[in-house]
């Protein structure tokens, strides 16, 4: 491997302040309450990391093929106003997240949106923010839309349609709220296009190879063989397009691993154990507030896992942790994926201009509807 390639791999780790903060927090908690090193590995959800890495590689492969550019040009040549385009992208992200899970939806819509930056003068950063919010709103509707819903559904005793019926009032209300916010946040002015937006060639063999590898990867996940699926994807790109392996955000994998370890250390801190044990005796309102608030600290999936140890699965708990996906970026892993993929430093602050008011609205709406 050349020195340029090595530098390209190392650079994101050096610049990743969020990863540095997670590592410092982990070291501090480990020093306060040491754990066996073997336990640290147990905190990491290996399947999630493998799935994330596989999707990152496959999405980057499609991007390198040029197909996102091709589709992006088709879209902006059909939808001529910023508002119509924003509504289309936001609704598409929400719809995909309902049935493909929120992270898979993001790996489809975010790279496509990023290509629009090359084709027009669109506010791509704002579009990505709204797509991150959209997958939080859309994924809460179904049992398979996000990891917390999968957990809640498995513990609820409800049928697939029964769970959808439980979540529908909140999901529809949040989606309508987000579409209304999208309408007011994007003007109806015409899209200013760059020259030569009528067509764009793409590498068909690489695209078809990515589609084939995607099918293999999904089958391996379905048969509970995620590592074999990842190895197949990795081997495929070694043979077809090695540059893909150098272009993905490798530090994101370490961010998620560090988050899993930090959450594991946090939930085992001795001073917090009496507080956790008291959860079972809390009132419904207190459990709801805790679900929303805890999601802002450890993210909504770990918050769900923790709370299900003490309270039963219910509509109220489901509304709480899904509302908690809004607010701070850490509230949902989908937020972190979207903002990292955007690659804009200022987007992290701008995200909270929209997400924090939506957290307040979602928390109030969820409480009233539950």
How would you describe each model-predicted region?
Residues 60-66, 96-108, 138-146, 266-268, ...:
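Short helix-coil transition sites and intra-membrane helix breaks within transmembrane domains
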Residues 43, 65, 69-74, 212-312:
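Transmembrane helical segments that form the transport core of multi-pass membrane transport proteins
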Residues 8-9, 73, 184-211, 243-246:
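Flexible interhelical linker loops that connect adjacent transmembrane helices
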Residues 89-91, 95-140, 305-318, 346-348:
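Hydrophobic transmembrane alpha-helices that form the pore/transport pathway of multi-pass ion
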Residues 9-16, 37-48, 158-170, 198-203, ...:
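Interfacial loop-to-helix junctions that mark the boundaries of transmembrane helices
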Residues 4-33, 45-57, 206-216, 223-238, ...:
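Hydrophobic mid-bilayer segments of alpha-helices in multi-pass membrane transport proteins
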Residues 164-175, 289-370:
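C-terminal transmembrane helix pair
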Residues 45-48, 77-89, 119-127, 204-208, ...:
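Membrane-interfacial loop-to-helix junctions in multi-pass transporters
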């Amino acid at each position: 491997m050349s020195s340029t390639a090595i530098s390209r791999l190392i650079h994101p780790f050096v610049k990743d302040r969020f990863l540095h903060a997670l590592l410092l927090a982990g070291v501090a908690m480990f020093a306060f309450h040491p754990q066996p090193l073997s336990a640290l590995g147990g905190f990491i959800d290996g399947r999630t990391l493998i799935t994330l890495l596989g999707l990152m590689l496959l999405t980057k492969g499609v991007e390198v093929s040029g197909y996102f550019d091709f589709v992006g040009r088709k879209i902006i040549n059909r939808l001529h106003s910023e508002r119509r385009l924003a509504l289309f992208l936001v609704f598409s992200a929400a719809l995909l997240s309902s049935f493909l899970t929120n992270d898979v939806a993001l790996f489809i819509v975010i790279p496509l949106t990023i290509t629009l930056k090359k084709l027009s003068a669109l506010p791509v950063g704002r579009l990505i923010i709204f797509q991150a919010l959209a997958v939080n709103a859309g994924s809460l509707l179904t049992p398979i839309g996000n990891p917390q819903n999968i957990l809640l559904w498995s513990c609820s005793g409800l049928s697939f349609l029964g769970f959808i019926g439980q979540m529908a009032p909140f999901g529809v209300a949040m989606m309508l709220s987000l579409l209304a916010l999208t309408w007011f946040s994007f003007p109806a002015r015409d899209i200013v296009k760059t020259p030569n937006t009528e067509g764009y060639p793409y590498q068909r063999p690489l695209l078809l190879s990515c589609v084939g590898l995607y099918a293999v990867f999904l089958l391996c996940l379905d048969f509970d063989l995620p590592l074999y699926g990842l190895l197949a994807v990795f081997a495929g790109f070694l043979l077809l397009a090695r540059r893909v392996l150098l272009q993905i955000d490798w530090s994101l994998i370490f961010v998620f691993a560090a988050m899993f370890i930090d959450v594991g250390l946090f939930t085992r801190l001795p001073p917090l154990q009496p507080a956790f044990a008291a959860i079972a005796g809390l009132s419904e309102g207190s459990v709801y507030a805790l679900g929303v608030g805890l999601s802002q600290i450890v993210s909504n999936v770990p918050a769900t896992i923790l709370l299900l140890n003490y309270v039963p699965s219910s509509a109220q708990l489901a509304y709480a942790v899904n509302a908690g996906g809004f607010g701070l970026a850490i509230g949902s892993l989908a937020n972190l994926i979207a903002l990292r993929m955007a690659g804009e430093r200022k987007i992290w602050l701008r995200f909270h201009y929209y997400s924090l008011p939506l957290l307040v609205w979602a928390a109030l709406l969820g409480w009233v509807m539950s």
